[in-house]
Amino acid sequence: KSRLHKQCPPPRTKIELTLCLIPDSIMQEPPQIKNPSITLYPFHLRNDGDEGYDAVAKNAQSLWENLADNVGTQFNSNELKSLREKLICYKDKQYYPDSEKENLNNGKLLIPNSGETLDLQLITQPDLQKLDGSIYALRIHDTYTADLTFCYKNVTMKVADLNQLNPQGCLLPNAIKPSLGQTLLLYAAPAVYDTYPKLADECVKAFVHNQQQASPEFRAEGKLFGSPIFEYDSREDDAAKRCHILVWLQDNPQTLQSATLTFNYYLMNLLCSRAKIVFVYRKARKKYREAQQIVGELEEKLPEFGEVEKEQSQEVKLQKLKKLLAEVRTKMFACAQQVRYLQEDRNTIDINAENYAEALTRIKSLSIEGDNLDFLQRFLDLAEDKYQRQIEIDLKYLIASQDLFQQSISTLRGMVEIEQVELDREQVKLYKQKEDEEKIRDRQLENIIFFVGTAI
């Protein structure tokens, strides 16, 4: 026998094989990331143009109140809880926006001795991990915004634990309630993962953790400073509830070096312009629907013209015409207001599209070879092509309707004037007739008195 054959074990009487199917979920290690950070960029109107030039919005301070009271409490950050004391728009812990006129420096809202950025003391998480944090408060024209960042250093964690960066959903829009909307930027280095898109999906799902009524869905992807970036948006009509998230997964050592303060400034301006464009466009669509309703009500009044014409009584006809004229003029004024609002919205989108384009150009100038920022460019194209064009179409329709109803008002006025002249003429005729009758009666009375006197 061969040597190989001699080494073989003797045959067994019976061999039993048991196949165990191990599920992929057990074989595959759960996704993990390194050094994750979350940055909140909220955008909240400081001014209310409807209340007058440079008028402060009624709830302008609510952004700072929510960051201090809600987020500060959830993260147990004393610095964040005392945020009011660090802002120049507060005096004795009370909101005092007038102080911005004297103390505002390039839009920076933190008091000078706090520095440009307020560092938060290390926050101890339930698992005893340390969490760093900082906040940078800014006013961009008529809007309050901030860069509130929380991050882990030298930590590898399961993606499923990302909700630790969002306790009780305190960083989501339904908690922050920013009037113009917000963007959340989640940055991390992949550790254990399948694919980048799948990892990004899992990060969003874990971070939101069913705390958002309408979950943000994947919208686009690109590459920034050599690393893939994914965009998610819930696209709710209410800006204060709309959840916009960017997931940036480090795939290049140059990424962090390129994400400078200069880049962050341009990114904040770009996201602010984006939020304003989305907010104003949604508002413009609402105004247009209201204007359409007014136009519909005006169209329902047109058949009444013919009905009034059939009225036999001149006085009743005149009263009905005057009433109809008053109703049409009131609705025309309301329609004209909506047109003016739409024109203002169009101008606002124009201005912010220009600001967005400028910020995007600046970011592109900082980008590295291989970057792909088409998803940012597509939003600009959407604003310039769809949003602005839609408002132009709406305005043309409403202005054409305005012209039609203006002609109707002119016709009504003419009818009222004619009927008024006819009625006045008739009344003069009746007055003269009555006067003549009275003269005849007076003459007859004089004759009677004369004859009676003569007879006596």
Positions of PLM-derived features:
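Membrane-associated alpha-helical segments
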Residues: 314, 320-456
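Generic local-structure boundary detector
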Residues: 49-54, 155-161, 257-259, 282, ...
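Extended alpha-helical interaction modules
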Residues: 109-326
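Long, solvent-exposed N-terminal ectodomains/accessory regions
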Residues: 19-184, 188-190
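Low-complexity, intrinsically disordered or signal/transmembrane-proximal segments
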Residues: 5-7
